[in-house]
């Protein structure tokens, strides 16, 4: 998620700007998500980023973080539907790429269908709906009926998000809402296998959960990729939370987290993970 204002006014070699716009050559269908509330800045950023190899531009109108909504950005735009429509229309006019939008159910009530119609009029190509209001943040139960209402309100592809945790819940969302696609968020933290699990469930195929060895090997691969992206020092700090997610629920994971959080070097992290796996 990249701030349009930050992208336009921060030094182009700033660490955050560089890392948020970097792509792996193997990522051929990667979108770039922008956020902001000024239509002209969104348009300028979308135009400048259109030739960077991304497949589409996504506008974030769903982020609930106070540091974002406090500036009237993210899900705060759901309280200003006319401005949200203007932001989307500006992006659509500025780029040859498809423009999509991520929204929530609403700010404190379900206003998503009304906003979705405005976004459709603005020319966006798809809408993703997190079925919680901003006031819920990530608590409580996602109201999937909002996704269904958005699907009925527009003729665009609608992507459902919220409380998809496994293959069974993915299938239920598709059936109950009629949505065209699924978005998995927190359930993928430390669990990249969830996508294979969902695919297998929808196809009626068997699926085997990853072994401890596979979890650890994947965490190590993730560490190496993070180092290649950010350098060792930053990667080691960033990976602490990811490793905690990878080993969540395993015996001795709390003690492992304590050890990992105290290690400053990548090789120390590798050795610690391998030793942990060997003891299970």
List each language-model region with its residue ranges:
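Alpha/beta catalytic cores of nucleotide-metabolism and tRNA/nucleoside-modifying enzymes
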Residues: 94-96, 109-126, 145, 149-160, ...
């Amino acid at each position: 998620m990249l701030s349009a204002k930050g992208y336009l006014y921060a030094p182009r070699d700033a660490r955050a700007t560089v890392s948020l716009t970097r792509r792996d050559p193997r990522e051929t269908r990667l979108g770039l998500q922008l956020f902001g509330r000024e239509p002209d800045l969104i348009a300028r950023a979308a135009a400048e980023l259109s030739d960077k190899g991304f497949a589409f531009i996504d506008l974030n109108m769903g982020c609930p973080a106070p540091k974002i909504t406090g500036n009237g950005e993210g899900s705060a735009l759901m309280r200003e539907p006319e401005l949200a429509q203007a932001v989307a229309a500006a992006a659509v006019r500025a780029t040859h790429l498809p423009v999509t939008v991520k929204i929530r159910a609403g700010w404190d009530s379900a206003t998503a269908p009304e906003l979705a119609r405005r976004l459709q009029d603005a020319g966006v190509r798809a809408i993703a709906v997190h079925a919680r209001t901003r006031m819920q943040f990530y608590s409580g139960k996602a109201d999937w009926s909002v996704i269904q209402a958005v699907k009925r309100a527009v003729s665009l592809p609608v992507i459902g998000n919220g409380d998809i945790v496994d293959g069974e819940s993915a299938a239920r969302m598709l059936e109950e809402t009629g949505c065209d696609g699924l978005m998995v968020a927190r359930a993928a933290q430390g669990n990249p296998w969830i996508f294979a699990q969902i695919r297998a469930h929808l196809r009626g195929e068997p699926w085997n959960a990853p072994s401890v060895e596979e979890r650890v090997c994947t965490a190590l691969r993730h560490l190496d990729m993070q180092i290649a992206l950010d350098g060792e020092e930053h990667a080691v700090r960033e990976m602490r939370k990811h490793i905690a997610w990878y080993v969540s629920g395993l015996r001795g994971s709390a003690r492992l987290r304590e050890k990992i959080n105290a290690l400053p070097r990548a090789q120390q992290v590798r050795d610690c993970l391998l030793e942990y796996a060997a003891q299970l």
